[in-house]
Design a protein with these regions (language model features):
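Acidic active-site catalytic centers that drive phospho-/nucleotidyl reactions
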Residues: 44-45, 72
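Short beta-strand-to-turn element immediately C-terminal to the catalytic PLP-Schiff-base lysine
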Residues: 57-59, 79-82, 308-309
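A generic, well-ordered mixed alpha/beta core segment in the N-terminal half of proteins
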Residues: 66-116
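Domain-length cofactor-binding catalytic modules of enzymes
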Residues: 2-28, 35-42, 48-54, 62-66, ...
Length: 395
């Protein structure tokens, strides 16, 4: 465990395996005055992200930086245990390729009569959002069939809110930037006017004001925050988009289960890019781990996932890591991992997705499962390790 100190706050990092870029991103966050009262905890799977660290948890009150949640609002996992013990894997692969749009693809028509986006405040392409329900997306999103030690099969789906999350996040981050820029300029203009009047230089006021309007806010654009009504609107939209992401995972699962003729025994969802609006805890690449709460932590496409139960540890912000965490960026992975090594690592797992285009998601680009298991003992109990028998990623 490490402690990192910034100008306004301190963060606990629950791992020693952290690179300099990630440390720099954490410290930059700690140097922002608006998070001086936040409780910040960084998860063991942490790594540098676009504008913020993946694996961040922090308490919030009346201000929040939308970038800290990011663009895939509500992204998470759905785990479904099915009654069947023997599955036709080629048929499953065909069903997924036929009925679950992946990559940038969406459904031609909505799969249901949806209305949950009617009250969304942020502008968004609602028609596209509804057609996206039941679609996987790309990147590290996946569909997997895993087996536990008792021979039970688990359908595991990892995806989020698709393009809708991007639209909402972008809207509020731009709004945050504009609000802070306007606030900064307003404060400076008041001070300059008073100063110039006191010095009898009123003729310089207009020119000085015009120059000030070109200034950037004192906070980096990627870390600008919303407050006031914009904060309330963001939290409101956050809840709606999180529901949208949950629906997306559920529709994918229901489609597969119906086409395969399976039967559901149990299911649960674990979200990892969101704000817990009840307890005001922001989680970016981390999950809720309250006392007795069931959760799933995916490791990689070879080693499967951990099914855990939370311990409700307040020092961890009642949180756990959302995965193993990358040790190679996508570009580094394509240079460091060969296709033969990738194929060898996936022996025994049925997948039509092991190819050059998915090397950046190969098992070798993530931290070892053993490291994550060791580091999470204080926040969860591991109940099961479920191992892949089938894996699908967009390709």
């Amino acid at each position: 465990m490490l402690e990192l100190n910034g100008k306004y706050n301190t963060a606990k990092v629950f791992t020693d395996n952290i690179d300099n870029e990630t440390i720099s991103q954490v410290i930059e966050l700690l140097n922002q005055d608006y998070i001086k009262d936040a409780k910040i905890r960084i998860m063991p799977d942490c790594h540098a992200g676009t504008g913020c660290v993946i694996g961040t948890t922090m308490t919030i009150s009346d201000k929040v930086c939308p970038n800290l949640v990011g663009v895939d609002i509500g992204c998470g996992m759905l785990a479904v245990r099915i009654a069947e013990k023997d599955v036709d894997l080629p048929k499953l692969d065909d069903v997924i390729n036929t009925y679950v749009p992946a990559g940038f693809n969406v459904n031609d028509e909505p799969l249901g009569n949806f209305s949950h986006l009617n009250d969304l405040v942020a502008p968004a392409n609602i028609s596209l959002a509804y057609c996206s329900i039941g679609s996987l997306g790309g990147g590290n999103h996946f569909i997997e069939l895993d087996k536990d030690d008792d021979g039970n099969l688990w359908l595991v789906i990892h995806t989020g809110s698709r393009h809708l999350g991007l639209e909402v996040a972008k809207h509020y981050q731009e709004l945050a930037y504009k609000q802070l820029k306007d606030l900064d300029v307003c404060d400076k203009i008041k001070a300059v006017i008073a100063d110039l009047k006191a010095k009898g230089r009123e003729k310089e006021i207009e020119k000085t004001i015009n120059a000030l309007k070109m200034h950037e806010p004192h906070i980096p654009k990627s870390l600008c925050y919303v407050s006031g009504q914009a904060f309330k609107d963001y939290i409101h939209d956050m809840e709606i988009v999180q529901k949208h992401a949950e629906l997306n995972r559920k529709y994918i699962a229901d489609t597969i289960i119906e086409k395969m003729g399976w039967h559901i025994c149990e299911e649960f969802q674990t979200i990892h890019n969101y704000i817990d609006t009840k307890n005001l805890i922001l989680r970016k690449g981390s999950v809720s781990a309250r006392d007795g709460e069931k959760l799933i932590i995916p490791i990689n496409m070879r080693d499967g996932s951990l099914i855990c139960v939370g311990k409700g540890n307040p020092d961890w912000n009642y949180s756990a890591p959302h995965g193993a965490g990358r040790i190679l960026s996508r570009s580094e992975a394509k240079d460091a991992v060969g296709i033969d090594e990738f194929r060898e690592s996936m022996k025994g797992i049925y997948s039509s997705s092991v190819m050059e285009s998915t090397i950046d998601e190969s098992p070798m680009v993530y931290k070892p499962m053993e490291e994550i298991m060791e580091n999470i003992k204080d926040t969860v109990d591991i109940v099961k390790v479920i191992k892949p028998v089938y894996n699908f990623k967009a390709h």
